[in-house]
Amino acid sequence: MVSEQSSNRSHPLDYYMDNQSTDHHTIAEDLEMQLTENDKQRIKSISEQIEPLNHEGLLKYGANLQQKMSHFSHQILDDVQSKDMGPVGETLSQLMGKLKSVNPNDINPEKQSRLKRLFKRTKASINEVFSRMQSVSSQIDRITIQLEKHKDQLTKDVEFLDQLYQENKTYFDNVSLYILAAQKKKKEILTETIPQLREKAHQTGNQMDIQATADMEQFVDRLDKRIYDLQLSRQIAIQTAPQIRMIQNVNQALAEKIQSSILTSIPLWKNQMAIALTLMRQRNAVSAQRSVTDTTNELLTQNASMLKKNAIETAAENERGIVDIETLKTTQNDIIETIEQTLQIQEDGRQKRQVAEKELNELEQDLKQHLLSMRK
């Protein structure tokens, strides 16, 4: 049905997604408006399969579609249950912990403790931080590999859910045709068959003719109930569509956040840490140079003025362009905030999946009850 529509006409199920409408008649009217000639031929063919007074045939009418819907619901439920996003949250928590483990203040001499500066352990401290940063960087690289795997799995899940969404559309189309075919047959019996039977019974007064009319009316009542059951199944398909999209959107948002961490946040953190270490080493180099200049100044009194001037100018030039540590801290805080937002999205996704799982279980039980009642 969908493939034969022109590109500028939306599927009724997509219209429902856009307008969040549960108006059963509106969806049915939209469906009838979009019927192609092939659809009309299929409706006619399906309608002709309904044999009046064939109660067993009526019982089986559309049952294969409903069984497919039951299997389809199982697929979605299994997917929701099997995709535990816990490892994603744990991996992101590990990443955030590693980013916090290296404090920019540790490589800023001005913010070190007085005791540490008193014993002149600045150089040793920087080396220690550099060594720790290398270790953390290696650990972050390993975490990045895990995040890549999680992102790939989330992307595959989105594609799988999209396939399920298309299958749900196909089911919606097929069950809608069965509903229209049954309604067509019902109208035919009410407007043609029953009036003829009533006329015959009125003319003959034969009890068997009267019973035949009553049997046909009873068949119409059962047919009407069968139509209602199929409409319930179609409503399940309508409600399933936004649930699939909800899970898809959460997975997609989480995958995008992971990609942002991998491609932007982590490289930026590494670059900024490397820059900070380089600048701190330059600061130490300037300090050492100043000491050498002072010593030389004492030994060579005749060149004291010139050496002092050169030392000051050199120190001034070397001091230019040093990045503020506060900027580095702000950058790191932004990185951590990004990861925290990702964790929040993951938590929201878990809650939404739990809601979806509960609703799907209820829908499945409802469908099973109708199937069981249909077989009685």
Swiss-Prot record:
One Pfam family matching this protein: TelA
Coiled-coil regions listed in the entry: none
Paired cysteines (S-S): none
Domain of life: Bacteria
Family statement drawn from the similarity comment of this UniProt entry: Belongs to the TelA family.
Protein name: TelA-like protein SERP0976
